[in-house]
């Protein structure tokens, strides 16, 4: 209380000062300070009073010096001293023009003791108003609008003026002084001052009050002392508000008034604090936005841009160590919740490089939705520089690319404000100051200390200069140290040795620490060096380091004070480049403008957990700066006293967010490039410029007028253009009450037109002016009050300006009221399509030395998985290069290369990407991949690797369309092709790489030896002739040779010419060892040679040594070695304590021999001889001992003809251990190490204890401390003697020592891991797709380990195993938080189990019949139909080729079903074609169907032969017709060819003379020419004939009436038939009817009959029946047997009626579709009604975390959306979604019940002992089970054996009645139940996994709904992945019960998916 009273008294005493400060802008304080300093040399006091101001104002000494100018320009990044004299005079500077008249505080109008704020403001305004005439005069001189005006302590104003014009200002009447504006830095974060944030705080009192900023990042520590509000009374989000939200959302909670809401979306819990040890990214971001620290030390508190704003902790990065990325669903959930809870701004300092702008991207769509709700989105641009900067990721282009963009997604979002990074002017960093207490002071200088633990390690130590042999400062060699270094700080210079080695040597010399002096000769601090953290070390700049060396040299015995602390120092990077070198370049790949704006992001000091702070750099730091600034802007809009409040209040949605963005961009300040003559920094790098928060707020308060491009964007996007004159329009909006006129800035630098250039020396990108280019307005810019004006501008380029360049710059407009508007523009002069999408082989990016091979083919060995660069050779200069003629692989399984793929270096983002294999004629063999888009290649700094596009591999097989089988392609030349459209373009580009498929090995002949004398030495060569007719001999010329068993695996051959028949003569030099092994006789030679496809020829031959004529004995391997040990080639041990030594050789006759044993006794060798090859083999037993032996070889058995004698030593005595002890004989230990001791025999050379080499003393004793891990440790000890013989002993030691009880303390079975677990219906054994339940088992490390999953404690069994279940449903990404602890320790760690699944296969409905063959004579066949899925991604393959896919980065939790319309052409082969159509969803569930098509080329058939029954006069004539070939059908026409019908088997009965046409047709649609047959022999008017004609017409009339009444034909033709019938009846009724008239009437009526058009054509019928089958299968028996109350029929019966109607053809397709839609609407309603009825209100009104709505709302929305759809397939997809929702709701209901207390009457347990949960509600699938893994109960009315979900159509068939005729079971042993009755959908299956029977009569051979998968598949990035095993191959008809397995479960996403899932890539 005393303190409060004291504060109150101070407030009262200082009311005058405070009153002044309440209205006094910071700018006026700065102005007064500048005047005071430059006129008197004194600084402004901390408290400004009228008295001190008066004292300063009376000092009239103005000091306008060069130093003052230089200081001001330096703050703007301009080096004044580098300007020439003309530039120094022409440059503009900021000055304060002080008036002669006194300011308000001195002119007597205010009381000196007290004046109110209102009085002060009133008098100040009068003073400012009186400045008008002087301002006008000043503006005439400066040509600049006057800036800020002052009137209280200073009477004056600021302006810009050229230096040369300053004296002119002083001459103007009324001007007292002209003073250079002082560079003013507050003690707060320098970044705030860069953007004029403090001025907003002071001038407008805006600090973010009443605003909320969402921080979508890695988390916030809400307990940090700077996470506070000064006053929490008037916050936007109260605790009550948050609790209302969380009650509905069912996640998240309230933390405090500063952080009112938070949730961990990644781990699905309320832990919002980032537990990353090194740095907390989200906490740093939060501090920049809204930290509210107190205190004067900038290192110990932080004040953010909007310190009074509230922050939402939307944690989207997991605390799990398994992932450092996040995924789409997680981000989307956080974005949506941010908007729902009412965030004004959301910040995302995250992204993936080089994004696009498609709203198919779920994050971009979510950002758009947030904008539409009025939440502004601010996103970082990325930290990757340009794509042309190789591994550096900076502002460079080494490749000369036209497309260098790297702006990341979701920062590419159109509505987001995307932020680039500028460097901070100063940096708080670790700095060193070195003093001696008297004359020395070095620093403070920025350093990088090896560890924070060593801050005191250098203080008060003596220093030691390490000198080299020349007496100069050493580079730190160990030999340069002396004993004097001990205990001192060593000083060395940079170079030669690694930093690590320098540290090691200093430590080894006994030094106490190390200082490394840089060698670049500058004062640049030495940071960013790789130091180990175990030895005290830092670096110094060259300048400071040399001063230290000089001082120590003069004072070697001084102990120096070394203070290492945090300090604010100038940022060296700011002096090199105002922009951060890492900030990502724009534009978006479609030439849309990005980034939007720049903010400080380089070297920013901000908050960390636990009241900590740190320095970080990145656009991640720039983005929150803008987010905070937009909170201030939003506060200004909410200010009811703002004169424009009424306008602002009506801004909603995107109108609001776009306005905020536009105002900030219009008021931004473009940054100049200090390294290139102060030209502009490219708008593609800085956007609109550096944010000026004060200017933006000024605009909102005074004149919120704006200028935008014609499309409404606050930047002009010229796109690409080719005309040198480009017109565009700008829209000016005047929101004031007075007319405004605008003039373009007259500054030629500002308004110049620029293009991009590259510094040839450094590769740095910069902008340069385009000489002769200009932009001019088409008219004066006048904007009436409250109106808009659209003005046309023309950009003119010189005719000489080359195309394929960017054109860019800034348009600056000065308003008539002094306001300014800034607008960047950017376009591409040329054709954006033209830039290459792929780098070529050996292209611009190819740099093997740097590890970048650019675009390169990859060859793979299937067996090992090893990949090789294809065609890689070494040129004459030793450089690696790709020879495109040497790229080949083999279809031979024994070859090394079995597959080919391409690793592409994509130079651009591309869309509609397709990868094909073409044959030698350019025909497509297969399509390996089709994808919507692929990202360009770039270097990822985090993973330290290039992100290429790895296209799928081809293994040389193809789909044989003739029979549907996979075949091996023929050998030959092929092409690997990629094609795509550059994003933003419209022209497809193609890039081809030729290769060969070659399965035949080269042929080799005439293997021989040759010799040459080279340098006085005989060099032997192995020669041969070789030939390969396709891929060619190995281009690397690698070969393997063996001479007499001496091998050279690294040989190479040279070409020595070519034979007449095309063989290449090759020579391979022998190695010295091989040459020594040669003898005068039969030398065995082996040549192993491959072709480029890796087919190998291994050729053996006997060769004669050149020049030799004798055939001596040759022993292979160069003879018997001097020593035979266990490592000798040819020795083989046996089990009797010895072994056998075997050797071989050649001799022209049999060889015999003897050897001596260990006792010296002689024995015969065991020899064999092969006369055909003159080769022998001999063997001798040897014993485990050391002894000398002799071997003699003879030419005879009598041993009289000695051929060769060998002396050798047998060395097989292994070393021995004596007194070997492990852990002193104990099997257990509780220590971290155990001791292994023992003694070895004297001949032992080495002893290895595990990986440690033991030291042996003189007595051969050893002792080793061996580290052990918790659990069983097998310790191996191996002794090795000099001969290589070894002895090994081992023992298992069990250790209870565990330094980290929690490390690896939990392991899971069946492949489950912490982090993401992705699977489908068949790939995970732990998951049951029928129930959606996952059973997770595993083991803990300790009995004391505790495990909590999803907030529930998991019981641990005595054997340390555990088991628990999770309800995963059938679709979605579901994270479960995991907490692992130990009862003996007071600590835990967090992890996450995330499951990403889709357990439902897609549906596939084809319009063509899949049951009966299709015949056609058109080679172009169209496959049409529809595929649906429960998620939004589908890919389509036809005949094994990937032909279509949808946007792969989906939000799997969106609940939106997928839909794909299929319309794909296929080129038919003549004869039979089996077309396989497969659709695959996001988790590789696949459904496959086959269409069999027979095609014959169109041809003209031979005309049929027509034969009359008689040619004599007759009453009737019967015409029969025969086709010329079998399989043809003859048709006839009685109406002149208008209509045709089949000739009846009995022929055509003719009753009247006339002409009849006949033609032949076949199944393929071919026809013959029509032949006419004229009947003339009918007797006219014969009574009998007349009666016959009447009868025939009567019959035909009756038939016509029957047809009319059938209802099968459309109205038009039925009406025509009725008219023809009436006409025929009239003719029949005529009394004078003749045969001719009756015949004519008959003919006309027959024509009308023939012209009847069926209501349901055959193709429509087939398609509809297929569709009805899919619907019926989807309903299953459960839902199908329910009754539609409106009809009283079951849904199955209703579908059966539709089938009958379709079969009957009595309704049109549209009518049937309408009826089907009604049935589906009724099904949807019934299902929704059932779900809602079975859902208690407390659950139904609860929130579905995935959608944010209640379960009841989800049900209603899905029902409404489904019923609103007009398409039956869409309704089916919604039905699936509703069924999924039912599963999820049921799970929620079950979760609300007490576990294990079910009261179900039918739940049973097959294993016994378990009490089932309650019986399901009507319509539910029995799902209850007892404990201990009981089987599903039989509760519910769905069959207890629901059908499986995978099948093909190959093995099971059905007869025409739908009966199963040949069902089989892959699992075997199971007896299937009887086939279902006709019309039923077969669902029963045999025991032990038998397949479901097929059945059902819709159609006769029901198509399957899922399919098999192959062993190898490709992922979404085209990568070959390991196969998951083939699915069952028997035919299955899949039943989909309503609650059985068709659900599309939509789970909340808090999981961990890397944004690289977009890089499915990447």
UniProtKB/Swiss-Prot annotation:
Residues 1-33 form the signal peptide. It is found in: Secreted, Cell wall. InterPro entries: C5a/SBT2-like_Fn3, C5a_Peptidase, Ig-like_fold, LPXTG_anchor, PA_dom_sf, PA_domain, Peptidase_S8/S53_dom, Peptidase_S8/S53_dom_sf. This is PIII-type proteinase. GO terms for cellular component: extracellular region; membrane. Residues 1796-1938 are annotated as: Disordered. It comes from Lactococcus lactis subsp. cremoris (strain SK11). Residues 34-187, 1931-1962 form a propeptide. Belongs to the peptidase S8 family. Residues 1797-1812 have a biased composition (Gly residues). Residues 1856-1865, 1890-1903 have a biased composition (Polar residues). GO terms for molecular function: serine-type endopeptidase activity.
């Amino acid at each position: 209380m005393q303190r409060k009273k004291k504060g109150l008294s101070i407030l009262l005493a200082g009311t005058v000062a405070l009153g002044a400060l309440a209205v006094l802008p910071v700018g006026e304080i700065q102005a007064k300070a500048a005047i005071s300093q430059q006129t008197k040399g004194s600084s402004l006091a901390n408290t400004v009073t009228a008295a001190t101001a008066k004292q300063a104002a009376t000092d009239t000494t103005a000091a306008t010096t060069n130093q003052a100018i230089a200081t001001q320009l330096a703050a703007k990044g301009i080096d004044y001293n580098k300007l020439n004299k003309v530039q120094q005079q022409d440059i503009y500077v900021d000055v304060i023009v002080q008036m002669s008249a006194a300011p308000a505080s001195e002119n007597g109008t205010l009381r000196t003791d007290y004046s109110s704020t209102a009085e002060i403001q009133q008098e100040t305004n009068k003073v400012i108003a009186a400045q008008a005439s002087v301002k006008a005069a000043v503006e005439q001189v400066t040509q600049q609008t006057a800036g800020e005006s002052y009137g209280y302590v200073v009477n004056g104003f600021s302006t810009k003026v050229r230096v040369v014009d300053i004296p002119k200002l002083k001459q103007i009447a009324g001007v007292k002084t002209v003073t250079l504006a002082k560079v003013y830095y507050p003690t707060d974060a320098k970044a705030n001052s860069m953007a004029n944030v403090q001025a907003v705080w002071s001038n407008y009192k805006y600090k973010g009050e009443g605003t909320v900023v969402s921080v979508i990042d890695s988390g916030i520590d809400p307990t940090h002392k700077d996470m506070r509000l000064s006053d929490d009374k008037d916050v936007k989000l109260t605790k009550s508000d948050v609790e209302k939200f969380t009650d509905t959302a069912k996640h998240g909670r309230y933390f405090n008034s500063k952080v009112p809401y938070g949730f961990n979306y990644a781990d699905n819990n309320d832990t919002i604090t980032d537990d990353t040890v090194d740095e907390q990214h989200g906490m740093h971001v939060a501090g920049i936005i809204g930290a509210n620290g107190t205190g004067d030390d900038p290192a110990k508190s932080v004040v953010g841009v909007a310190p009074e704003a509230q922050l939402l902790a939307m944690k989207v990065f997991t605390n799990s160590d398994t992932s450092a990325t996040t995924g789409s669903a997680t981000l989307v959930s956080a974005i949506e919740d941010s908007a729902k809870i009412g965030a004004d701004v959301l910040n995302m300092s995250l992204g993936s490089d080089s994004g696009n702008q498609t709203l198919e991207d779920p994050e971009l769509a979510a950002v758009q939705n947030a904008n539409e709700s009025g939440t502004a989105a601010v996103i970082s641009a990325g930290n990757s520089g340009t794509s042309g900067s190789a591994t550096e990721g900076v502002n460079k282009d080494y490749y000369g690319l036209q497309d260098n963009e790297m702006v990341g997604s979701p920062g590419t979002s159109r509505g987001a404000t995307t932020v680039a990074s500028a460097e901070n002017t100063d940096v708080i960093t670790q700095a060193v100051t070195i003093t001696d207490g008297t004359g020395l002071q070095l620093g403070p200088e920025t350093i990088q200390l090896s560890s924070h633990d060593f801050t005191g390690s250098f203080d008060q130590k003596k220093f030691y200069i390490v000198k080299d042999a020349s007496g100069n400062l050493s580079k730190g060699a160990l030999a340069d140290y002396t004993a004097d270094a001990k205990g001192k700080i060593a000083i060395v210079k940079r170079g030669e040795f690694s930093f690590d080695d320098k540290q090691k040597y200093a430590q080894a010399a006994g030094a106490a620490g190390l200082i490394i002096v840089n060698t670049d000769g500058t004062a640049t601090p030495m940071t960013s060096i790789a130091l180990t953290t175990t030895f005290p070390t830092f670096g110094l700049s060259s300048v400071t380091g040399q001063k230290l060396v000089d001082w120590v040299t003069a004072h070697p015995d001084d102990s120096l004070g070394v203070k290492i602390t945090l300090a604010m120092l100038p940022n060296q990077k700011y002096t090199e480049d105002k922009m951060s070198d890492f900030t990502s370049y724009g534009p978006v790949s479609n030439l849309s403008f990005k980034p939007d704006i720049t903010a400080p992001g380089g070297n920013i000091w901000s908050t960390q957990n636990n009241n900590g702070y740190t320095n970080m750099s990145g656009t991640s730091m720039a983005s929150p700066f803008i987010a905070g600034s937009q909170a201030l802007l939003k506060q200004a809009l909410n200010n009811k006293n703002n004169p424009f409040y009424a306008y602002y209040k009506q801004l909603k949605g995107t109108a609001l967010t776009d306005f905020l963005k536009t105002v900030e961009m219009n008021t931004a300040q473009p940054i100049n490039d200090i390294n290139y003559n102060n030209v502009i920094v490219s708008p593609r790098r800085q956007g609109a410029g550096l944010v000026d928060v004060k200017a933006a707020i000024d605009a909102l308060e005074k004149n919120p007028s704006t200028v935008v491009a014609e499309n409404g964007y606050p930047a002009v996007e010229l796109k690409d253009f080719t005309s040198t004159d480009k017109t565009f329009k700008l829209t000016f909006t005047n929101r004031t009450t007075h007319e405004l006129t605008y003039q373009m800035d007259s500054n030629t630098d500002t308004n110049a037109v620029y293009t991009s250039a590259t510094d040839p020396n450094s590769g740095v990108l910069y902008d340069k002016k385009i000489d002769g280019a200009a932009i001019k307005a088409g008219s004066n810019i006048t904007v009436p009050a409250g109106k808009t004006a659209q003005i046309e501008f023309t950009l003119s380029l010189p005719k000489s300006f080359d195309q394929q360049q960017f054109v860019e710059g800034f348009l600056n407009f000065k308003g008539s009221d002094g306001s300014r508007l800034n607008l960047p523009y950017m376009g591409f002069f040329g054709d954006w399509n033209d830039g290459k999408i792929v780098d070529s082989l050996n292209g611009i990016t190819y740099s093997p030395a740097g590890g970048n091979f650019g675009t390169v083919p990859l060859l793979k060995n299937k067996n090992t998985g090893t990949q090789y660069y294809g065609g890689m050779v070494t040129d004459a200069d030793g450089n690696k290069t790709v020879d495109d003629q040497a790229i080949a692989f083999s279809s031979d399984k024994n070859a090394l290369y079995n597959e080919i793929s391409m690793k592409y270096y994509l130079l651009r983002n591309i869309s509609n990407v397709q990868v094909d294999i073409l044959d030698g004629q350019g025909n497509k063999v297969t399509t390996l991949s089709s994808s919507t888009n692929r990202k360009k290649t770039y270097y990822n700094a985090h993973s330290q690797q290039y992100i290429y596009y790895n296209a799928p591999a081809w293994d040389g097989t193809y789909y044989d369309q003739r029979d549907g089988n996979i075949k091996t392609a023929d050998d030959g030349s092929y092409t690997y092709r990629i094609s795509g459209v550059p994003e933003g373009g419209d022209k497809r580009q193609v890039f081809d790489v030729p290769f060969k498929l070659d399965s035949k090995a080269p042929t080799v002949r005439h293997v021989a030896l040759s010799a040459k004398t080279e340098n006085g030495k005989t060099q032997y060569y192995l020669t041969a002739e070789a030939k390969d007719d396709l891929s060619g001999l190995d281009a690397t010329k690698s070969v393997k040779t063996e001479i007499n068993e001496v091998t050279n695996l690294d040989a190479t051959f040279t070409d020595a010419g070519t034979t007449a028949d095309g063989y290449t003569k090759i020579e391979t030099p022998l190695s010295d060892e091989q040459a020594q092994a040669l003898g005068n006789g039969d030398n065995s030679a082996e040549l192993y040679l491959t072709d480029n496809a890796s087919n190998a020829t291994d050729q053996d031959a006997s060769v004669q040594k050149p020049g030799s004529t004798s055939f001596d004995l040759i022993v292979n391997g160069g003879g018997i070695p001097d020593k035979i040990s266990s490592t000798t080639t040819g020795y083989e041990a046996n089990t009797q304590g010895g072994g056998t030594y075997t050797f071989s050789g050649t001799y022209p006759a049999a060889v015999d021999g003897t050897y001596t044993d260990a006792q010296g006794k002689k024995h015969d060798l065991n020899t064999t001889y092969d006369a055909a090859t003159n080769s022998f083999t001999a063997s001798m037993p040897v014993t485990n001992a050391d002894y000398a032996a002799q071997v003699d070889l003879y030419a005879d058995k009598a041993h009289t003809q000695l051929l060769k004698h060998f002396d050798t030593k047998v060395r097989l005595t292994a070393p021995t251990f004596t007194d070997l002890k492990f852990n002193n004989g104990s099997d257990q230990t509780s220590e971290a190490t155990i001791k292994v001791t023992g003694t070895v025999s004297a001949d032992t050379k080495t002893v290895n204890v595990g990986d440690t080499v033991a030291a042996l003393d003189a007595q051969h004793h050893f002792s080793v401390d061996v580290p052990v891990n918790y659990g069983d440790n097998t310790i191996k000890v191996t002794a090795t003697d000099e001969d290589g013989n070894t002895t090994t002993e081992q023992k298992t030691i069990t250790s209870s020592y565990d330094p980290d009880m929690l490390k690896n303390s939990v392991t899971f079975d069946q492949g489950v891991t912490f982090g993401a677990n992705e699977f489908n219906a068949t790939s995970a054994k732990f998951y049951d797709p029928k129930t959606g339940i996952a059973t997770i088992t595993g083991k803990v490390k300790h009995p004391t380990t505790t495990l909590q999953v999803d907030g529930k404690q998991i019981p641990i069994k005595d054997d340390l195993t555990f088991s628990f279940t999770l309800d995963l449903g059938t679709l979605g990404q579901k994270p479960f938080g995991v907490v692992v602890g130990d009862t003996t320790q007071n600590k835990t760690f967090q992890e996450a189990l995330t499951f990403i699944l889709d357990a439902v296969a897609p549906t596939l409905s084809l319009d063509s019949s899949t049951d009966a063959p299709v015949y056609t004579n058109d080679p172009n066949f169209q496959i049409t139909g529809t595929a649906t899925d429960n998620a939004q991604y589908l890919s389509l393959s036809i005949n094994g080729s990937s032909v279509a896919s949808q946007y792969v980065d989906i939000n799997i939790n969106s609940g939106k079903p997928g839909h794909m319309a299929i319309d794909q052409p296929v080129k038919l082969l003549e004869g039979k074609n089996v077309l396989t159509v497969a659709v695959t969803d996001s988790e590789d569930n696949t459904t496959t169907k086959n269409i069999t098509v027979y095609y014959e080329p169109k041809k003209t058939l031979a005309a049929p032969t027509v034969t009359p029954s008689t040619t004599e006069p007759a009453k009737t004539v019967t015409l029969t017709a025969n086709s010329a070939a079998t399989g043809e059908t003859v048709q006839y026409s009685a109406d002149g060819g208008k209509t045709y019908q089949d000739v009846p088997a009995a022929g055509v009965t003719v009753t009247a003379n006339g002409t009849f046409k006949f033609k032949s047709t076949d199944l393929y649609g071919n026809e013959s020419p029509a032949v006419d047959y004229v009947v003339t022999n009918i007797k006219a008017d014969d009574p009998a004939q007349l009666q016959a004609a009447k009868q025939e017409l009567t019959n035909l009339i009756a038939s016509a009436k029957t047809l009319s009444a059938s209802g099968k034909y459309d109205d038009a033709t039925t009406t025509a038939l009725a008219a023809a019938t009436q006409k025929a009846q009239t003719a029949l009724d005529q009394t004078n009817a003749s045969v001719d008239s009756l015949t004519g009437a008959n003919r006309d009526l027959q024509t009308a009959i023939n012209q009847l058009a069926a209501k349901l054509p055959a193709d429509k019928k087939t398609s509809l029946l297929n569709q009805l089958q899919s619907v019926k299968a989807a309903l299953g028996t459960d839902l199908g047997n329910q009754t539609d109350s409106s009809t009283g029929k079951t849904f199955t019966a209703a579908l059966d009626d539709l089938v009958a109607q379709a079969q009957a053809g009595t309704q049109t397709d549209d009518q049937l579709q309408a009826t089907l839609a009604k049935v589906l609407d009724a099904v949807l309603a019934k299902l929704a009604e059932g779900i809602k009825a079975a859902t208690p209100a407390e659950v139904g009104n609860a929130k579905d975390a995935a959608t944010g709505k209640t379960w009841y709302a989800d049900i209603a929305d899905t029902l409404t959306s489904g019923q609103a759809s007009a398409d039956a397939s869409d309704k089916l997809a919604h039905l699936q979604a509703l069924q999924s929702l039912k599963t999820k709701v049921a799970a929620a209901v079950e979760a609300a019940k007490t576990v294990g207390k079910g009261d179900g009457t039918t739940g049973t347990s097959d294993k016994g002992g378990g009490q089932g949960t309650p019986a399901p509600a009507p319509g539910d699938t029995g799902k209850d089970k007892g404990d201990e893994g009981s089987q599903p109960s039989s509760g519910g009315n769905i069959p207890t054996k629901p059908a499986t979900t995978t099948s093909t159509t190959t093995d099971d068939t059905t007869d025409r009645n739908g009966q199963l005729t040949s069902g089989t079971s892959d699992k075997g042993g199971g007896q299937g139940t009887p086939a279902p009755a006709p019309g039923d959908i077969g669902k029963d299956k045999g025991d032990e996994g038998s397949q479901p029977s097929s059945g059902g009569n819709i159609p006769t051979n029901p198509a399957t709904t899922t399919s098999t998968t192959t062993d190898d598949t490709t992922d979404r990035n085209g990568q070959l992945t390991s196969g998951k095993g083939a699915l069952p191959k028997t035919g299955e008809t899949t039943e989909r019960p309503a609650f059985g397995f068709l659900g599309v479960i939509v789970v909340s996403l808090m999981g961990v998916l890397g944004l690289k899932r977009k890089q499915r890539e990447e």
